[in-house]
Amino acid sequence: MTEKEEYRREVLLISLEKDNKRLLEIYRRGEEKDTLSQRAYENVYERVSYALSSSSLMNLEKLPDLEERIIFFFDEDYYDNVPSSSKRDIRYYITAFKRFFLILKREGEIDEERERELYSLLSSYL
């Protein structure tokens, strides 16, 4: 992973960690109206970190692009074998990837067209 990609990954992970702590606090106070499990809040940070880590996902000679990472992460065979995974958790992963795309767009790494294509790919898993 290049230094720039490592930096982007760290920015995402810091953002996810802050959001997850805030959401977990809301959940514990009983203010969350949704029926989502506490486990989903606790696991999304770890899972998205894993999804963005090319070395832990694929044995490829080249660094996989975002589309390859998304397809691999959400692939039915893989997703069904992730410990504690459930289909209702999927919106957390999608939200996390969307945040990552916003970071990339803000940094000028992707344009609006690429962002739309990535969102379209994510929406195919809903």
Name the predicted role of every residue range.
Residues 1-126:
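Charge-rich, intrinsically disordered N-terminal extensions
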